[in-house]
Amino acid sequence: MAVAPPGMDRVTTAMCGTCANEGAYKVAILTYANNKRGVDVPPTELELCSCMSNQAPGSPDYAIMSLKSGFHGRLLGALSTSRTRTSYKVDIPAFDWPAA
């Protein structure tokens, strides 16, 4: 792609802005996890088993920081980073992620 920054040669499409944010969160978290573990190192048996119960170490306690007045979407991950309207968030479980 002629307009892509150097070293970025792939495109990921999404159906909406929320989906794009959810995808970006996932890519960022997986990139961090791969760099921490080692790119060619597979998950341990404990990580594989514990992730099915949403427990560490397979489901680590990572966080996404957002802005206090930002709107990032209405799906669970994106809604956890949105902080614009109470009507979007009330009665919906959310990740305990920080805001700046």
Language model regions located:
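PLP-dependent aspartate aminotransferase-fold enzymes
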Residues: 1-100
